[in-house]
UniProtKB/Swiss-Prot annotation:
Cofactor requirements of the protein: adenosylcob(III)alamin
Record NCBIfam families: PRK06556.1
Annotated source species: Streptantibioticus cattleyicolor (Streptomyces cattleya)
Enzyme class, UniProt record, top EC level: oxidoreductase
InterPro entries attached to this UniProt entry: RdRp_reductase_class-2, RNR_lg_C, TSCPD_dom
Catalytic function, reaction form: a 2'-deoxyribonucleoside 5'-diphosphate + [thioredoxin]-disulfide + H2O = a ribonucleoside 5'-diphosphate + [thioredoxin]-dithiol
Protein name: Vitamin B12-dependent ribonucleotide reductase
Annotated stretches, region: Disordered: 519-555
Superkingdom in the source lineage: Bacteria
Function: Catalyzes the reduction of ribonucleotides to deoxyribonucleotides. May function to provide a pool of deoxyribonucleotide precursors for DNA repair during oxygen limitation and/or for immediate growth after restoration of oxygen.
EC number: 1.17.4.1
GO biological process terms held by the UniProt record: DNA biosynthetic process
Biased composition (Low complexity): 526-553
Keywords: Cobalamin, Cobalt, DNA synthesis, Nucleotide-binding, Oxidoreductase
Amino acid sequence: MHLDNSSCNLASLNLMKFLRDDTASDGASGAGGNMSLDAERFAKVVELVITAMDISICFADFPTEKIGETTRAFRQLGIGYANLGALLMATGHAYDSDGGRALAGAITSLMTGTSYRRSAELAAVVGPYEGYARNADAHKRVMRQHADANTAAQRMDDLDTPVWAAATEAWQDVLRLGEQNRFRNAQASVLAPTGTIGLMMDCDTTGVEPDLALVKFKKLVGGGSMQIVNNTVPKALKRLGYQPEQVEAVVAHIAEHGNVIDAPGLKPEHYEVFDCAMGERAISPMGHVRMMAAAQPFLSGAISKTVNMPESATVEEIEEIYYEGWKLGLKALAIYRDNCKVGQPLSAKKKEEAKTEAPAEVEKVVEYRPVRKRLPKGRPGITTSFTVGGAEGYMTANSYPDDGLGEVFLKMSKQGSTLAGMMDAFSIAVSVGLQYGVPLETYVSKFTNMRFEPAGLTDDPDVRMAQSIVDYIFRRLALDFLPFETRSALGIHSAEERQRHLDTGSYEPAEDELDVEGLAQSAPRQAGPAKAATTAPAAKAQEPAAAPSPKQAHNSTELLEIQQGLNADAPLCFSCGTKMRRAGSCYVCEGCGSTSGCS
């Protein structure tokens, strides 16, 4: 949170590695052992890491040239720490306590003060960062603010007091050396999340976070989960004065129940030491915010930390958390409401199975499995020769005795081995589908109007134009095997039906309304019943002819043609792509004037 188009070189230290057990040195008994933070060794490691981080900027590559320029000009570093939650637990401090916050503030102050002291020492050798000249006053003012915050910080006990003393000395050196040498780095410290690297660093907790739960499950990328048990509990119990057998009993209780409530031999006043972010004894959201506020005055950047809130948290409660964080001077704040995501990397428990009673087993009534209906040895069939765009071929369509289509064979003349193989494979696929019950109309709807070469005129009077061989084949199959209603809905009609449409306005075949003898003797059929035609008064013969009734659609295809004035199955123009209009038995394009070849 410094400059746009910049980067921050991060590093983190495992605080538990600097916790010193003084029991052996002072001869104290195992129970209630003394612990201290090795401030001197911690400062030495910070100096070493800061030096390495600054050197790495000279050799690092960056995503964009602008980011590289800004980073080299300001040389921001981001040293931080991890395992603070485990450190506080091991030293007997509750996370949400004055003692815990005092120790966290002391460690952060020592880390940042030591970092800027080493930055000033580096500047004496290799010079300050490029942007220091125009930011000198602001930089030195920030250093004074850090030092003032260190002076005003509250000392709580013997554990944090030596750390505060080392931090005070470091900040005095920062002010003195910074005035003389200037600073090598515009920023020195942040608190990063250390989510995945924390596991590789042997950390029980990440960043400034408390432990999520004493027993937790981590979701793995490849599936499944792994159980993670806090290894700091025995040290904390020892620090609090419990005997080894009591420690074993409490640890066994935690492994079984996941918390310390009602653990054998554990005093209720010590429960708070083992409070976690989630679970039966969860740290309050403001406890997280107060811990961040304890560390923020001693950091160059911000804190990447999650404020855990229960699933029942309201909008007003979340608003209050952000408002309090602003009042306490936090630079950044992130809320995580439990179960707000479908999958979260860490959880306090495995997903519980539904506790509702299992529904009564329902007996399977119908279970459908497709069954192949093979054709008999002797089968009726039709072989059709065709020509599409000059390409000749033969189609054999065999059917069941009940007239249902069962298989199709295709053979193209002058074909090579590749085309012959493709046609055989296509025929087998369609035939097997038909025998397993795939309706022919499904194939027709999918394969008609597919356009590729060869295409054009055919020698079939019922299908004068085809946009491809596949288009022709399934139009021919539809005409041979589908009922009128089905293929009419698909826009497929024979030459006779198209002629009837031109004469009568309907594709449907005429109904036999009169008997054979009546047909032989009667006049042409009228629109009304025959009886009405013979009894009509003579005067009506002189009346003007009634206007023809509007054309009525009997199916979706005819309705589309009435609305658009076009044939639903008309092809697209080969020249301009416009929908063509039927002209006789062929088609003409109204866009460019092209014809299908015979109009």
